[in-house]
Regions:
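Long, contiguous hydrophobic alpha-helical segments, chiefly transmembrane helices and signal peptides
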Residues: 1, 17, 21, 29, ...
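Membrane-proximal N-terminal amphipathic helix
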Residues: 21-49
Length: 152
């Protein structure tokens, strides 16, 4: 009798514990995506502002031929001086957060993300390596709400 009650309770508790664990990783994924995307946006805004300020100071029509996005995720951590427009390298992240749904936990965090370049097509799964315009999860898993993590 006691054994059957324990097995029923275990059968109820285990699935809800797994659901809570998955929900926590989903929350972490959303937070990490937001952190990286905000850093990319801040980089772009800083680049545009420094170019505009440099034009005003020097009276030059300096042309920014690039997209204004970072070349790699590492640039967000290591810092960038924007071609000398900034007195010292500006950093946008302390570290690159990991994708909590990466399949291999030994993979470095910066390699756990899929990346899109500004010139890539929206549905492209191959990074053009021109710059980093966006990041996404490489996971093929399905979220609790039925969407794919890679589409977040």
């Amino acid at each position: 009798m006691t054994l059957s009650i324990l097995s029923i309770l275990a059968g109820l508790i285990l699935p809800s514990a797994q659901l809570v664990s998955k929900r926590n990783r989903e929350i972490e994924l959303k937070r990490n995506l937001r952190t990286i995307r905000n850093a990319i946006d801040d980089y772009k805004k800083t680049n545009e502002k420094l170019i505009e300020d440099n034009k005003k100071i020097q009276g030059l029509a300096k042309d920014d031929t690039g997209s204004g996005y970072p070349k790699t995720l590492d640039v967000l951590v290591e810092g960038h001086d924007f071609g000398g427009l900034s007195k010292e390298p500006k950093k946008f992240l302390r570290r690159i957060p990991c994708d909590p749904f990466r399949s291999d936990k030994t993979t470095p965090c910066k390699e756990s993300w899929g990346m899109k370049s500004y010139v890539d097509k929206p549905d492209s799964t191959m990074w053009g390596q021109e710059d980093v315009y966006d990041v996404y999860s490489k996971s093929e898993d399905t979220a609790i709400d039925g969407t794919k993590y890679k589409d977040w």
